[in-house]
Amino acid sequence: MIQYLLFATFFGLLLLGIHRKVIARIQRRPGPPIWQEILHMFKFSFKSTWVPRTASDTLFVGVVLIAIGIWTAALFVVLAGGSLLIIFGIYMLHKIVEHGFGLSSGSPYGKFGGVRSVISAASEIPLFVSVAAIALFTKSLSISDIISYQETSGPLILAIPLSAVAMYIVIVSKMPYGPFSIVEGKELVSGYKTEHFGVWRAGLEICNGLKTYVLLMTFILVFFGGVPFGVMLLLMILIIVTLSFVCALTPMLSPFDSVTVQTLITGVMVVYVAILWWWWI
């Protein structure tokens, strides 16, 4: 399992590198090599590490370990075919951790990034209303049961495409350089992670790699079913390329516009699930 954890981390970082490369090529720039995020992780691992004088030492260090821990747990939950509710609970916990990152440093940039993380959560989390549609069809929120259902009834992406779109938007909101990346806006330098440097930033890179891998793996298992491992990796690459196109071709929204757009999408999803429920009964 340790080997798979390492693989998930490095492949997730490779996916983020592909993401940056595709965005650069769309914008007619050469861009960094696709292994750039992996190099970043190693680079920060050997740089000087410190805790700012204005920071809360315990919180400043603890949030990095918590961030890695919760996404490691999420990976094992997915591999074990556990409940989607646990994955979504970890996602919500990650928003709290992001807020902790911002508060821990004492930096105004970090604080604003942490506040924006809470603002974004208000609109992202309701998108999980899409799980209601999944439960209507599969009668379960267990990933293993959802995979079993698709073996006999076909991929859920064909049965409930709007739920897949809602989950896709959740993933878009966690991708760097995307329209909903308000927690990392240029006016905030690096947002909530501005003051985390050295080994702490390397820990954040590990967290980002795991998070990317887990979210894409969950999306594929829930909407495409239990595909072979090689096919799953190929699908991850294809999905990350589509995400890169979305991020490259759409402007970063303001916090207000980001919440407004995602709230409207949530409203559409509520109506969609209500229609499915009425039709199903």
Descriptions of predicted regions:
Residues 1-281:
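Alpha-helical transmembrane segments of multi-pass membrane proteins predominantly involved
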